[in-house]
Amino acid sequence: KEAKVDVTVYDHGVGQATKAAAGIISPWFSKRRNKAWYRLARLGADFYQELVEDLAKDGINTDFYQQTGVYLLKNNEEKLEELYQLALSRRKESPLIGDLAILTKEEVAQQFPGLQGFEKLLYASGGAHVEGALLTETLLKASGARVIREEVALTVTDTGYQIAGENYDQVILATGAWLGQILEPLGYQVDVRPQKGQLRDYQLDLDTDDYPVVMPEGELDIIPFQQGKISMGATHENEMGFDLMVDQALLNQMETEALTYYPELAQAEVIGERVGTRAYTSDFSPFWGALPDRAGLYVASGLGSSGLTTGPLIGWHLAQLVVGGNLRLDPADYPVEQYVKK
């Protein structure tokens, strides 16, 4: 926006993982050994503070981001101490973590009445949640970009690129699990596969505005939003391709598990389900940057289930590459050529 770049966004929107997501921003407890990934996730969490501040300065509503803290539950509660120490050691470079504490049932009951299924849990006040659909809508509106909501293809021309009959000097392909469908016709092999994710939304007659996110072990998360809305999910289905059908049986199974932690959900009204398609690479690492043999073509994919944590920061970096700005991360740590090959 500041660099006076003329931007057009093509967004088909069908199956988009971000829109279907209730994202948890809390990367500090991850035990992934991939240092480049952790740096991206840590700075991605920090970046929300900047993003929210910038939007607020422009008078734009930032309700998509709520910092209400997170609860981490472990089947073996001895592991909580280990995770507490890990987060404590990371707090120096990530003060956003905020207050860290191992809480008892009694202490939790004051913050999140009715939560059960544990003796102790780990709490970090800096954890946040993001409403994916609202985030995408807010960013598109704030960007002032022209938005064309249709499925398009990319053609290489002598002078640059063509999309839907219009010519462009530079193109960013942030097309998630669909990256291969755009690049394969141009002769590339793309190491990105789809993963289906589903979640269910509930409405409770309760004030849930300040409830922390609940993260038990496994796939289940319970994510309270404002005014009694609670999301539960999400599934991680690797064999379903780009399927977008709601699987009630699978969500009912997850709900049964959720009820062991939060029986109150039995009183809630189900207000909808969401389905989206995440993008994964074969080694679960994201990649972003310029396509080595094509000037002016930039890509990003493979963000997986941490996409709401890392996505905005990757988007900022791609914009910096387009306008020749300074970067905070080294693109060599997220090498495009490892996943997109001729």
Model-identified regions with their sequence ranges:
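Active-site substrate-recognition segment that forms the wall
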Residues: 1-3, 12, 23-24, 61-64, ...
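A conserved short coil-to-beta-strand element within the FAD-binding core of flavoproteins
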Residues: 128, 146-162
